[in-house]
């Protein structure tokens, strides 16, 4: 008797067929492999632009130019009366100024994005004559000439001052490290008295690399 047409044989034949679930899992695996390959390719592409010792990050937001690094200095203005001014020349460490012919490409000023005061403060960097005593009158005249961008830093209702950086490009001027003593950071306390150490300025000078490994950010 031929049993091929029996109910049991039909059930066995059906069990031998590939299940839809298996085909779906196989398709999902293939898709996952393709996605993994895409992610690996993207990761390799991004790695090319990541900061290294030869191409460090400029203040954590932008890569330095190839062959450049940066040196940071911190300034803490003293007490500044309402409507008054403060100025201080840039003073880089001796280990940097020993290489005074190395070119400087950019200067960046950063301020804490969480201000502890509710006044409005103007900050700028300017090249000033060596004869200037950075008196209140001299700084006032510099702010008034409108020849330099100014960082307006003030209280924000959210508690966060988003506009807390100002970048100066000196590459076309061919400025060098030796020229930095001719530049000064200037501050104007517009609306209220600024207490001592109430504002901290971080000045980052991007310059050609010098042969001191400890100067390179990691």
From Swiss-Prot:
Query: Which keywords fit this entry according to its UniProt record?
Result: Acetylation, Capsid protein, Ribonucleoprotein, RNA-binding, T=3 icosahedral capsid protein, Viral nucleoprotein, Virion
Which GO terms label this protein's molecular function in UniProt? RNA binding; structural molecule activity
Q: Does the keyword RNA-binding apply?
A: yes
**Segments of skewed composition (Basic residues):** 12-22
Gene3D superfamilies in the record, alphabetically?
Answer: Cucumovirus coat protein, subunit A (2.60.120.530)
Q: A single GO CC term, please? A: T=3 icosahedral viral capsid
Modified-residue entries (N-acetylmethionine), positions: 1
Indicate the transmembrane segments per the record.
none
**InterPro entries assigned to the protein according to its UniProt record, in alphabetical order:** Cucumovirus_coat, Cucumovirus_coat_Asu_sf
User: Where is it located?
Assistant: Virion
- Give the span(s) annotated as Disordered: 1-30
Q: Which family does it belong to?
A: Belongs to the cucumovirus capsid protein family.
Q: What does this protein do?
A: Capsid protein. Probably binds RNA and plays a role in packaging.
Q: What is this protein called?
A: Capsid protein
